[in-house]
Amino acid sequence: MDYKEEQKQELEVLESIYPDELRIINDEYPKIKFEVAIKLELDTGDSTSVLTKEHTIIAEFKLPENYPDEPCLISLEAQEVALNDNEEDNEEDEDEVEYDDHGNKVLKKFENLPDLISFKGYLPELTVQLESQIETDMLLGMQMCFALISSIKERCEQWYSEQLNKLEKQYELEAQEREKKEQAKFHGTKVTRESYLEWRSKFRQELKLDERDQVRRMKAHHGKLTGKQMFEQGVVGTGDEYMEEDDASVDDVAKGLAKTEIANQ
């Protein structure tokens, strides 16, 4: 196989297919090197979100001396270009990022989900997939750059759709959780007899209501305990002492009545 001629022919074919996207870095064999700007056609599906960025994958190809019997070397780079003047809005949104109790970013209602997707993290995985494809599809021995360029575009667009779907599901779950928390504010704790008595006991202890009631009763009885209070508090000699006091009171009354009768005579 004439490797030089094979590579020259493939480069000419690619120039005709990608007249605006292809840029030749070196066209001298055996160090042919070029890059292709692959514009992705992304779709938000049924989502109400809109695309505010244009995503392009820059694929750089280096052709070894024995290409295509040896695989080409591929380097990938992701580029993002704003479609509208949204840069100032995006900067303001960054200041309003919120996180949950576990440190995960919370998706807000006003947040545009497609803007959260970046291809930079996917490119290492994509590079491995392309290397595997060369072997799986048995591309060695034939011109493979066009097939790989097409695969890059297809895989990236598929990956984007999957990521957007995940974000939408995550947003729905978070929206449901927020709704539950909002609804919980309007539902108080169910009160049972046991919970009420427990609350009442703590409440009276905190405000010392029982002590206040006791002081109030003492004042009502001129500082003396009632018989019930003395019995409950275990005052010693309650019965005998009060019996003696009662007997003394009866004697005093009797003496008073006797004096009154003598005086009247």
Swiss-Prot record:
UniProt key word Repressor: yes
InterPro entries on file: GIR2-like, RWD_dom, UBQ-conjugating_enzyme/RWD
UniProt-listed GO biological process terms: cellular response to amino acid starvation; cytoplasmic translation; negative regulation of protein phosphorylation; negative regulation of protein-containing complex assembly; positive regulation of cellular response to amino acid starvation
One GO CC term on file: cytoplasm
Gene3D superfamilies the record matches: Ubiquitin Conjugating Enzyme
Sequence ranges assigned to domain RWD in this UniProt record: 9-159
Repressor in keyword set: yes
Record key words, sorted: Repressor, Stress response
Function: Acts as a negative regulator of the GCN2 kinase activity by disrupting the GCN1-GCN2 interaction in amino acid-starved cells.
Complex and partners: Interacts with GCN1; this interaction prevents the interaction of GCN1 with GCN2 protein kinase and GCN2 activation in amino acid-starved cells. Interacts with RBG1. Associates with ribosomes; the association occurs in a GCN1-dependent manner.
Name the record gives this protein: Protein GIR2
Lineage: Eukaryota, Fungi, Dikarya, Ascomycota, Saccharomycotina
Record gene name: GIR2
